């Protein structure tokens, strides 16, 4: 508690914390403001009766937006266009030499890639908002025949609605970047954190009201065990000893110190889960738009397979695909973000070496070997956490209403991971000011 008080006594850190809180509050306010032409009363009444199966196509995406998607607020599509754009740009660094060169150019290259990500975000936001509005106009967003837009709407009203939701997605992207730049923690992750956290009280009361006190107590106990397990794994790391050789500069002696290189078990964080969920969401949305807003049986074979296998998260095809995509993005994201050869070269440049391992290529191979072993465990851990709620649904465990997912494995993983990362960043700034760390 004293450390938290000290954090607010630091003028610079206090300013960053208040700025972050202000941005999150503005984001949550925007998530509750209906877009123009939306029948909010009808949506509110319909969402209370929406079942898990009916909302399955959008459940995780709606969770990330804090319920804004199915309410058709001005922030309805939230950060999903930005996440999808980030996936595409990261993939381009592997397949297109120009993007690979940009990645190697350091800060200037990263700035250029960020610019490409922003442009692509606007395009994807326009595409996704058009799809959502098309479904709403056909009265298929919340079920067949459910009207969520005003009855006297015209084409111009739909255009305004698309522009509003697109502008909202761009504004959310800007707010996330501002938090990262001027606040504490990762802005996009904190916005997802806020969206999930705001759903917890309401959905907890829904579980208590629908299933009774015994089930509610079991859910709380399960969540507590899950939180402990997630914290344990997220804090786990492999510490590789590093020795720095002594060297003389003039009459001064430098080096000779010992330290370690920390490699986390879950090096990728929550990014693979978010990537995988957004990638599964896109073909279902496109199929629903192409198929005149309906998820009924289609004559087209690819539409028929998507409808049969990806419409319901409890199907084993959905579970296997989600599991595989999470593992794939774990390996892909770490391979993009962490380069053992670059790490080994930096160590060699400053006179560092791993005892028993020769500097240069042998060090890079050793780091790659250790990282692959850790990544195997970490990716399996992420995949199991991600599909755990889906397996429970497949076994017949009723998750309640559409909003019960904040108590699922993915939501808990995101909440705990973002909280730990943010606290560690605050702690590092406290340590710079000679304050006691928050984690002590």
UniProtKB/Swiss-Prot annotation:
GO terms for biological process: intracellular protein transmembrane transport; protein targeting; protein transport by the Sec complex. Its main location: membrane. It is a multi-pass membrane protein. Pfam families: SecY. SUPFAM superfamilies: Preprotein translocase SecY subunit (SSF103491). GO terms for cellular component: plasma membrane. It comes from the Bacteria. The keyword Aminoacyl-tRNA synthetase does not apply. PROSITE patterns: SECY_1 (PS00755), SECY_2 (PS00756). The chain crosses the membrane at residues 17-37, 74-94, 116-135, 155-175, 178-198, 213-233, 270-290, 316-336, 374-394, 403-423. Keywords: Cell membrane, Membrane, Protein transport, Translocation, Transmembrane, Transmembrane helix, Transport. The central subunit of the protein translocation channel SecYEG. Consists of two halves formed by TMs 1-5 and 6-10. These two domains form a lateral gate at the front which open onto the bilayer between TMs 2 and 7, and are clamped together by SecE at the back. The channel is closed by both a pore ring composed of hydrophobic SecY resides and a short helix (helix 2A) on the extracellular side of the membrane which forms a plug. The plug probably moves laterally to allow the channel to open. The ring and the pore may move independently. Belongs to the SecY/SEC61-alpha family. Component of the Sec protein translocase complex. Heterotrimer consisting of SecY, SecE and SecG subunits. The heterotrimers can form oligomers, although 1 heterotrimer is thought to be able to translocate proteins. Interacts with the ribosome. Interacts with SecDF, and other proteins may be involved. Interacts with SecA. This is Protein translocase subunit SecY.
């Amino acid at each position: 508690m004293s450390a938290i008080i000290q954090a607010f006594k630091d003028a610079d850190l206090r300013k960053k914390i208040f700025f972050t809180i202000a941005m999150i509050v503005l984001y949550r306010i925007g998530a509750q403001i209906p877009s123009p032409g939306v029948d909010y009363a009808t949506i509110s009444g319909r969402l209370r009766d929406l079942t898990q199966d009916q909302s399955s196509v959008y459940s995780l995406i709606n969770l990330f937006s804090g319920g804004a998607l199915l309410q058709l607020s001005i922030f309805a599509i939230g950060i999903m266009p930005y996440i999808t754009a980030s996936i595409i740009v990261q993939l381009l660094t592997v397949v297109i030499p120009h993007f690979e060169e940009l990645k190697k150019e350091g800060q200037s290259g990263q700035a250029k890639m960020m610019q490409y990500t922003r442009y692509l975000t606007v395009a994807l936001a326009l595409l996704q908002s058009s799809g959502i509005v098309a479904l709403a106009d056909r009265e298929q967003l919340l079920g067949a025949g459910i009207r969520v837009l005003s009855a006297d709407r015209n084409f111009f009203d739909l255009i305004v609605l698309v522009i509003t939701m697109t502008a909202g997605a761009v504004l959310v992207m800007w707010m996330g970047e501002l938090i990262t730049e001027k606040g504490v923690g990762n802005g996009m992750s904190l916005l997802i954190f806020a969206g999930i956290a705001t759903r917890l009280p309401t959905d907890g009361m829904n579980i208590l009201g629908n299933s009774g006190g015994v089930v509610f107590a079991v859910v709380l106990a399960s969540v507590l065990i899950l939180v402990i397990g997630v914290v344990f794994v997220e804090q786990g790391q492999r510490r590789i000893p590093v020795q720095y050789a002594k060297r003389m500069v003039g009459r001064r002696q430098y080096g000779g110190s010992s330290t370690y290189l920390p490699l986390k078990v879950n090096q990728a964080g929550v990014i693979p889960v978010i990537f995988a969920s957004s990638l599964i969401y896109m073909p279902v949305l496109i199929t629903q738009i192409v198929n005149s807003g309906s998820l009924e049986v289609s004559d087209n074979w690819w539409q028929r397979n998507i409808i049969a296998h990806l419409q319901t998260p409890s199907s084993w095809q959905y579970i296997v695909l989600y599991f595989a995509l999470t593992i794939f993005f774990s390996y892909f994201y770490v391979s993009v973000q962490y380069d053992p050869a670059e790490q080994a070269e930096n160590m060699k440049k400053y006179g560092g070496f791993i005892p028993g391992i020769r500097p240069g290529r042998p060090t890079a191979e050793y780091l790659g070997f250790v990282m692959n072993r850790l990544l195997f465990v970490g990716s399996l851990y992420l995949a199991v956490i991600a599909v755990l709620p889906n397996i429970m649904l497949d076994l017949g465990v009723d998750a309640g209403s559409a909003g019960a997912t904040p108590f699922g494995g993915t939501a808990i993983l995101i909440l705990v991971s973002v909280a730990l990362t943010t606290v560690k960043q605050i702690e590092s700034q406290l340590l710079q000011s000679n304050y006691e760390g928050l984690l002590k």
